[in-house]
């Protein structure tokens, strides 16, 4: 990979708690505008990897090094609001640094995510799909050059899942950002990803879905169900969030 296109480098990164190994000898380069999907069983170290990239924890050994000024947008796996906190959608979005984006980019996000009618609503009263759209907007309004989505499909209805798949597909081109998507949704990862990293406390295998499907390490974890994965085709049409 050309150094000028590299956004972030993890070099021989390991993380231990006492004698317990959570991650071992992780080497990952994330390029500008690249989309990477991370899969693995429960306890594989996916959440630990995200925390290391976010800088929430320090590696036991190895280095996590940005190759350019890094602005990370993060959509967490879980988000809860205390019942006593009267937090409106507009309050949460006001915390984002909207001045980073041009007016038309901000409007695109609001239109694409169908947010205008939600602005006065309490976060506590939103559905799972509505909450996910608001969290995604908040991350995008910071104009990240790296967007991390942690299990973005969790708890969504099928219609919202389809919309979000399509929206994720369009994001790198629109915002010129890299994306790291952590997902248990093996069907989407193998059909909709260009580069996949399979994690099980170390990197078992990585590459394009067609390469992973014939990997013995992948088949040990997930079986032989993905020997001929669908070739990804970008979506050209406009898609808006379910209202």
From Swiss-Prot:
Subcellular location: Cell inner membrane
Molecular function terms, GO-annotated: ABC-type zinc transporter activity; ATP binding; ATP hydrolysis activity
UniProt catalytic activity: Zn(2+)(out) + ATP(in) + H2O(in) = Zn(2+)(in) + ADP(in) + phosphate(in) + H(+)(in)
Topology within the bilayer: Peripheral membrane protein
Entry binding sites for ATP: 40-47
EC numbers on record: 7.2.2.20
Top-level taxon of origin: Bacteria
One BP annotation, GO: response to zinc ion
Pfam family membership, one: ABC_tran
Principal location listed in the UniProt entry: membrane
Cellular component terms per the entry's GO annotation: plasma membrane
Boundaries of every ABC transporter domain copy: 8-225
Keywords, comma-separated and alphabetical: ATP-binding, Cell inner membrane, Cell membrane, Ion transport, Membrane, Nucleotide-binding, Translocase, Transport, Zinc, Zinc transport
SMART domains linked to this entry: AAA
The keyword Ligase is assigned to this record: no
Family: Belongs to the ABC transporter superfamily. Zinc importer (TC 3.A.1.15.5) family.
Assembly: The complex is composed of two ATP-binding proteins (ZnuC), two transmembrane proteins (ZnuB) and a solute-binding protein (ZnuA).
Protein's name in the database: Zinc import ATP-binding protein ZnuC
Taxonomic path: Bacteria, Pseudomonadati, Pseudomonadota, Gammaproteobacteria, Moraxellales
Originating gene: znuC
């Amino acid at each position: 990979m050309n150094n000028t296109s590299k956004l972030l480098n993890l070099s021989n990164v390991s993380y231990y708690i006492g004698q317990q190994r959570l991650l071992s000898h992780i080497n990952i380069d994330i390029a500008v505008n690249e989309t990477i999907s991370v899969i693995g069983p429960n306890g594989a170290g996916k959440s630990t990897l995200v925390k290391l990239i976010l800088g929430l924890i320090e590696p036991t050994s190895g280095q996590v090094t940005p190759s350019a000024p890094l602005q990370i947008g993060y959509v967490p796996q879980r988000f809860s609001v205390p019942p006593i906190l009267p937090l409106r959608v507009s309050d949460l979005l006001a915390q984002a640094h909207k001045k980073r984006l041009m007016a038309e980019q901000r409007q695109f996000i609001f239109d694409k995510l169908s947010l205008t009618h939600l602005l006065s609503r309490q976060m506590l009263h939103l559905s799972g799909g509505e909450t996910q759209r608001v969290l995604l907007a908040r991350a995008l309004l910071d104009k990240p050059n790296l967007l991390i989505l942690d299990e973005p499909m969790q708890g969504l209805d099928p219609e919202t899942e389809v919309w979000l798949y399509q929206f994720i597909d369009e994001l790198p081109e629109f915002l010129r950002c890299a994306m790291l998507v952590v997902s248990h949704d093996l069907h989407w990862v193998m059909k909709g990803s260009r580069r996949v990293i399979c994690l099980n406390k170390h990197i078992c295998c990585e590459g394009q879905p067609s390469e992973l499907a014939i990997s013995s390490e992948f088949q040990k974890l997930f079986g032989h169900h993905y020997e001929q994965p669908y070739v990804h085709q970008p979506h050209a049409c406009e898609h808006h969030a379910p209202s």
